[in-house]
Amino acid sequence: MDPHQIIIRPVISEKSYNLIENEGQYTFEVDRRANKNQIKKAVEEAFDVKVKKVNTVNVKSKPKRQGFTRGRTSTWKKAVVKLAEGDRIELFEGV
């Protein structure tokens, strides 16, 4: 798989921002079929950094409604990537 097919988007939240500042860990939404090795290679190729560790979480869908219309959010996969000491991803710097 192409790195841009594996990494869907960065996850920007208060918790993910604290992980960046304190732990050097970056959070991404990734393709649900991707495994940890594929995610590691995709991040290393896309951002030219050295990945030390990858943790993944399958985030379940939640029921939602708007008025009488009921639906569900999509199930998605979250990857928390720890980089080698001294490496940073510039995409997250301006946030």
Curated annotation (Swiss-Prot):
One of its GO terms (molecular function) is structural constituent of ribosome. GO terms for biological process: translation. InterPro entries: Nucleotide-bd_a/b_plait_sf (IPR012677), Ribosomal_uL23-like (IPR013025), Ribosomal_uL23/eL15/eS24_sf (IPR012678), Ribosomal_uL23_CS (IPR001014). Keywords: Ribonucleoprotein, Ribosomal protein, RNA-binding, rRNA-binding. Pfam families: Ribosomal_L23. SUPFAM superfamilies: Ribosomal proteins S24e, L23 and L15e (SSF54189). GO terms for cellular component: ribonucleoprotein complex; ribosome. Part of the 50S ribosomal subunit. Contacts protein L29, and trigger factor when it is bound to the ribosome. Belongs to the universal ribosomal protein uL23 family. PANTHER family: 60S RIBOSOMAL PROTEIN L23A. One of the early assembly proteins it binds 23S rRNA. One of the proteins that surrounds the polypeptide exit tunnel on the outside of the ribosome. Forms the main docking site for trigger factor binding to the ribosome. NCBIfam families: PRK05738.1-3 (NF004359), PRK05738.2-4 (NF004363), PRK05738.3-2 (NF004366). This is Large ribosomal subunit protein uL23. It comes from Rubrobacter xylanophilus (strain DSM 9941 / JCM 11954 / NBRC 16129 / PRD-1). The gene is rplW.
